Amino acid sequence: MLSDDTSFRQISSERILNYTVNKWINDATGFSVASVKTPTSRLQGSFVVATEAHDNLGCPHTLEHLCFMGSKKYPMNGILTKFAGRACGDINACTDVDYTSYELSAAEEDGFLRLLPVFADHILSPILSDEAFCTEVYHINGMGEESGVVYSEMQNTQSSETDVMFDCMRTSQYPVTSGYYYETGGHPSELRKLSIEKIREYHKEMYVPSNICLIVTGCINESRLLSCASGIVKEILANGIITPPTWTRPWCSTNVDYTIPEPILKTVKFSSEDEYTGSVSLAWNGPSALDAYTVFAIETLCEFLSESAVSPFGQTFVEIEDPFCSFVYFYVSLRVPCSIQLFFDSVPLEKINGLEQRALRLLAETKQIDMNRMKDYLKTRRDQYLTNLEAFPSSLFMKILTLDHVYGSREGKDLPNLLKMLEYNRLLEEWEEKDWLKLLKKWFVENNSVTVIALPSFEMAENIKKENAEQLNKRRCLLGASGLEKLAEKLKKSKEKNEQKLSVNLISSFRISDPESIRFYSSTTARTRSAGQPFDNEVQTYIDTDVSSENPFIQFDHIDSSFVQLATYIDTSMIPSSLKPYLSVFAKYIEAAPALLSGTIPTPYHEVVKQLERDTVSLNVSLSFDTSSCGYAYYETKRELLSIEIKVTRENYEKGVYWIRNLLAKTVWDRERMLSVINQQLADIPFQKRDAEFILPSYFDIRLYNDCSLKYSLNTLSQEKILRELRDKLQNDHSSIFDAFQKMRNYMLQHQAIRIHVIGDILKLPQPISTWNKLLDSECHRNPNMEFLSTFSKNYLKPQEFGSSSSLTVIPMPSNESSDLVFSIPGITSWLDPSLPVIVLIANYLGLMDGPFWNTIRGSGLAYGFNMSIDVDGGVLYYCINTSPDVYKAWASSRDLVKSLISGEVQVSSFDLESAKCVSYSIVSELENNAIYSSKNSFTLLSIKGLNKDEDHKFLEKVKQVTLQQFLEGLKIYCLPFFSSSNNLAVITSSLAKIEQTVEQFTEEGFNVNVESLHEIQGIESESEDDLSVGGNDDN
């Protein structure tokens, strides 16, 4: 009977601490379901499809895009995203070399379960129309230019450092008979040849029920989940979707020889304006990912060898006066076999040749293992795993269950071994030195490797520009006017088909989620008198019994945890602007510096680091002054603060405070250590200058903020000159530099500049307040007449930069084949501004998947991404267009749509407005997704912004009340100025091929357009290779 055919048989049930991992299979179809109950507000789901390809056409990647564009039951593009919005949910997808994951999340169970069958239909029975292929994958427009969302995304991969390196590594490490050899994203040259028929064939081959697993994490009712999954199986059977008897499961071929017969060394070039630094990568083929114990041991050894300032690789290559690279690390890709990879980032060119031999020699000559440090590291690794289970259980279990589905037994036999990390950690604690040396010898010394050296090349960028221009001219001549006209008409019709208006009844049939059903996590908060009005709860009563000689600013958030997170936030407003640029060096320096731990003789930095790592689970010293690509979120802040965050076990609470004190107040200045830090940071800058994600916010930082702001002082474009000067001064007169750093530290050690946040089981902490006295009493200066400082970037904003005539700067980016654009306008400066709900709603509306802007920009292949971002902390609004083949047309199309919405020519759908409001519920549910997230958000609201703890929930009610008229008025005030030639500031990072055309187009729009190189913007000369390092001679 059908009912029997739709049932599920449990094949696995495993327990890890408080988590139970369950997995079931439907025998009639092979469709499987896995579930882990996690204490999170949001439910996460993923349909995982094991995908293998033996060409560079990109079928796995294109399907990831096309499956969203209509299905058999819901045959119109956009219905899936409309339903997801009404469920307070998000949908996404990603493609790796061995699987494609279709991801969804929702703020409450009912909406999540209603969305699952809709998503499943799109995955199992997609339309895969010619029109969707045209706009989403590849097309030639009426100007003869190549475009398409997938094509634009993959275009940059042909010349960027990371992509050309991985491309060479992949084709050198694996034989052509392996699916790992190929680019599943699709090479642009191959995407030109791809057809929708080929994609349909690939879907039929791979997207069979037995090759799909639904993984769900969160507070899910498993009975309801299985009932929903049975409904999906019923549809599978009714539609005759079967796994053919002759079907071959991906990645199960045993005919591939993965042996690397001899060491391989290859060199590749990538596009870059600066030719100062490159990268070196090594790879070995390891054991099967299903050999979980060996893989865990290899990962442990790799991290032990590289992930610390006192690790062998760190000491040899990074933590020296003249470093070989800015960062060195291992990564193990979980495949069959695994790929064990070693990366050296930002390597000065004069040090790049022979670096791989140094690395291989270090591995071969390792005859001893520091077993004391290994013992400490295994304890730390166990604690880190436990903290990840607390903070990020969904992502951890998703990774394991995905691996199990792609490679493991379909009867669940491999799953128990993949979940035994804590047991493996315990077993490794029993290993002797000879066991680690044996592992090292087998997989790194006696095992052949592949090395790829990636070198920067400005000539390559120029050649690409020339080749693209020649191809375009050739294409135009070949097609002729009539051919181009036909292509333009084809694209137009495809867009019209993809953007057909959805039925009102169809959209409304999927009811909107009830916000009252959303579960938000909340901590129990208490605080000292300096931090604000006390709360009325048992935690407040408990901390009030602890008498402190000082009145520190501390907020406590009580949650059920075996660990304690200590965070110290330091307001930097008292530091003179002349010293603020040094903060980046200070933050990195104190993580691994000599210190006065006792007495007057400094403890060497390597001993300090060893003790620190022994006593703590994690350490993070950070400055969060920027967000990549100007993608600011309205709720973010802390841009003018230095933070020191330490996580410890509960019994080490006092040690956590002790280490914050040592890092902040007891580190001592050492010339060699400081030079090492400076040179590491200098080596990173060429890499950052090749990436628009760094350059875009950096440009606005130096234009919109004065030199008192960290945004101005610490961004990529400002730091290069500062670091060069600091390096020169340190070599010639280090005492004056040490005096400057000490002076800067004294400004930070002001009682009123420090705010403290403690998260954990507060009721089990002895002396929760007075423990901090050793830091605050003995090290901090107190001014009784001074209030606690509260500084935001908006305090340093230069509003005059938004002049009467718009300034648009075009920055040539040889490393990119596409362009990025950001426009900025004055924004609001308070989280209580009555306009904020309207602005957030507008930003949500602009970003709706398959909404009007999505269809106009991404749906037309004009850009891969776009968004409106809100920086309340900095007082600025941004409109961003990312990875665009035609940035002017993307901007102009956005402008035309905004004007049409304001005029009423294009109607604002009530359903889209509802979905935009639901996005805000999704955002807040993510901010309070679990107890730790909720605690951090509580501190931000109460102790940074000075708001009430329930302010986010009040804000949701305000968003809910925004009317259509308020929305339209908001578009005029807060969106239309992005498209004016006055009162805004803009920057474009342009591919070389598009500069002239872009300048001409925006000039015609009335903009004052300037083309400036990065060196011109920075006001510095290009540095010669001889100047890049301190040491010159490289004989070590």
UniProtKB/Swiss-Prot annotation:
Molecular-function GO terms, alphabetical: metal ion binding; metalloendopeptidase activity
| Protein's GO biological process | mitochondrial protein catabolic process
In its UniProt entry, the species of origin is given as Schizosaccharomyces pombe (strain 972 / ATCC 24843)
Its Gene Ontology cellular component terms are: mitochondrial matrix
Q: Which Pfam family is one of those matched by this entry?
A: Peptidase_M16_C
Name recorded for this polypeptide: Uncharacterized protein C3H1.02c
PANTHER family from the UniProt entry? METALLOPROTEASE, PUTATIVE (AFU_ORTHOLOGUE AFUA_4G07610)-RELATED, PRESEQUENCE PROTEASE
SUPFAM superfamilies referenced in this protein's UniProt entry, alphabetically: LuxS/MPP-like metallohydrolase
Domain of life, per the record?
Eukaryota
Q: InterPro entries from the xrefs? A: Metalloenz_LuxS/M16, Pept_M16_N, Peptidase_M16_C
